[in-house]
Amino acid sequence: MSIILGIDPGSRITGYGVIRQVGRQLTYLGSGCIRTKVDDLPSRLKLIYAGVTEIITQFQPDYFAIEQVFMAKNADSALKLGQARGVAIVAAVNQELPVFEYAARQVKQTVVGIGSAEKSQVQHMVRTLLKLPANPQADAADALAIAITHCHVSQNAMQMSESRLNLARGRMR
């Protein structure tokens, strides 16, 4: 059993999603958004750090998965996004959580089956995969999708390792 915290970073809204994985079974534990209503960036970063730390304390995840930085049209926005990611990662590292990063395209490909999927498609598939009564808010859905991606990637990596081990054992006999 593993608990995975997914984070969709943003300097104004940071989405989070928490799921439990037992084998191939995924269970929704919680999701939401850390909203920073202050104007100055240092105060927003402090709120993100505190919010992520609180979520980690509440859910006690085993893994921390976060979206990688993408190239934004606006350099200032990209820098702020990078800083928001940074404080979220520091919150995880301070709690000794292993950190995994996934590209947005990989997350969409894993959850929807199309790397260029729309936000509404991600919301719908997250709702379906986690058997939720309604679509989660967009940023929370993205965070849940990141957590789901981590489950799929780690499950596939484990299966590949087992296959290689079995193959090696077969050669030794």
Swiss-Prot record:
Reactions performed catalytically: Endonucleolytic cleavage at a junction such as a reciprocal single-stranded crossover between two homologous DNA duplexes (Holliday junction)
Main location: cytoplasm
Record-linked Gene3D superfamilies: Ribonuclease H-like superfamily/Ribonuclease H
Residue sites binding Mg(2+) 1 per the record: 8, 139
A Pfam entry, by short name: RuvC
Cofactor details (free text): Binds 2 Mg(2+) ion per subunit.
One BP term from GO: DNA recombination
Quaternary data: Homodimer which binds Holliday junction (HJ) DNA. The HJ becomes 2-fold symmetrical on binding to RuvC with unstacked arms; it has a different conformation from HJ DNA in complex with RuvA. In the full resolvosome a probable DNA-RuvA(4)-RuvB(12)-RuvC(2) complex forms which resolves the HJ.
Protein's recorded name: Crossover junction endodeoxyribonuclease RuvC
